[in-house]
């Protein structure tokens, strides 16, 4: 059964070369992952992409880092990749992700560290990069809330403190959304509400 098909035709012109100025902003919840992208090798080299070894969830970095160097794009509305979700041992399974939360946190922090605030990005690209950072941070916080232990809340507070210290301006941008505020909440009611939103979103979008 097909749970989710990722399409970008509402934002990207199809079957033609275009720039970010020709694109429309992707709405929240619509993000690109590794299976959606094919990069030119020269662009990958220029970006200096280095993925941490023996770490899951680095596909976020594969998308995020080189994308900042992209100028022209070509979108094909074709299913290049299909991914089965539902096995208990999958890296995106909720329980597995919580058990590997340190790796998710590491990737989250590397995303912030690799965001080039000093560069002038086209508006659509900048919005996407900020949204990608936001959704990754929300996922990290939501999983830590689901973990439910004191150590999970300590890790969440440490993550948010590290992100804020790394880039205060961007942190402010990714923490002003209502869902972000709930996921990042330090109080118990906020964490309970975060768990409820996570469950509803999980059923609606069909992830893990």
What are the functions of these language-model segments?
Residues 51-53, 119-123:
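Short helix-to-loop capping/linker segments positioned immediately adjacent to catalytic or ligand/cofactor-binding
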Residues 128-143:
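Amphipathic alpha-helical repeat scaffolds of TPR domains
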Residues 125-131, 153-157:
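Short, charged, amphipathic alpha-helical segments
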Residues 1-74, 84-98:
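Donor-binding/catalytic cores of nucleotide-activated saccharide
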Residues 146-208:
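Membrane-interface aromatic/basic loop that binds lipid-linked glycans or pyrophosphate carriers
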Residues 121-127, 171:
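Short, surface-exposed acidic
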Residues 78-87, 93-120, 139, 146-168:
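Catalytic core of nucleotide-sugar-dependent glycosyltransferases
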